[in-house]
Amino acid sequence: MLGAYLPIIVLVVVAVLFGCGSLIFSSLIGQKKPSVVKMAPYECGCEPVGSARERFSIKFYIIAMLFILFDIEAVFLYPWAVLFKRLGMFGLMEMGVFIVILFVGYIYVWKKGALEWE
C-alpha cells in the first residue's frame, strides 16, 4: 500500500529539500548591502503614491462572488456532458431543472441591479 505512494512522497521530499536548500544557499552566499533605495517599496518602477490601505468598492466583491457563483455551474455541467448518453432522459431533466434554477437566480440578480455598474 505504501509502495504505491512512495514516488509521490519522494517527489515531495525532494521538492521541499530543493526549495529550502535554494533559500539557505542564496542567503549564505548572497550580498547583503541594504540601502534606503533597496528597502523602499517598489511598484512597477514608480514611486508609491498614497496608502496601500485604501478601501475597495463593495461592487468589486459582489461581482466577484456572482462570477464564482455562476462559473461554478461549469463544474457541474462538464461531468453531465461527459455522461450525457448514460444518464438518458433522467439526466437531461435534472440538468434542465438545474439550468432553470440558475436562470431564475440570474434574473433575480439582474432585477436587483447587482450587475449595474454605476
Curated annotation (Swiss-Prot):
Subcellular location: Cell inner membrane
Domain of life: Bacteria
Annotated EC: 7.1.1.-
Gene3D superfamilies, A to Z: NADH:ubiquinone/plastoquinone oxidoreductase, chain 3
Pfam families: Oxidored_q4
Membrane topology: Multi-pass membrane protein
Reaction(s) the record says it catalyses: a quinone + NADH + 5 H(+)(in) = a quinol + NAD(+) + 4 H(+)(out)
GO MF: NADH dehydrogenase (ubiquinone) activity; NADH:ubiquinone reductase (non-electrogenic) activity; quinone binding
Keywords: Cell inner membrane, Cell membrane, Membrane, NAD, Quinone, Translocase, Transmembrane, Transmembrane helix, Transport, Ubiquinone
Principal localisation: membrane
InterPro entries to which the protein is assigned, alphabetical: NAD(P)H_OxRDtase_bac/plastid, NADH_UbQ/plastoQ_OxRdtase_su3, NDAH_ubi_oxred_su3_sf
GO CC term, one of those recorded: NADH dehydrogenase complex
UniProt xrefs under PANTHER family: NADH-QUINONE OXIDOREDUCTASE SUBUNIT A (PTHR11058:SF22), NADH-UBIQUINONE OXIDOREDUCTASE CHAIN 3 (PTHR11058)
Entry's family note: Belongs to the complex I subunit 3 family.
Subunit structure: NDH-1 is composed of 14 different subunits. Subunits NuoA, H, J, K, L, M, N constitute the membrane sector of the complex.
Record function comment: NDH-1 shuttles electrons from NADH, via FMN and iron-sulfur (Fe-S) centers, to quinones in the respiratory chain. The immediate electron acceptor for the enzyme in this species is believed to be ubiquinone. Couples the redox reaction to proton translocation (for every two electrons transferred, four hydrogen ions are translocated across the cytoplasmic membrane), and thus conserves the redox energy in a proton gradient.
Protein name: NADH-quinone oxidoreductase subunit A 2
Source organism (scientific name): Geotalea uraniireducens (strain Rf4)
Lineage: Bacteria, Pseudomonadati, Thermodesulfobacteriota, Desulfuromonadia, Geobacterales
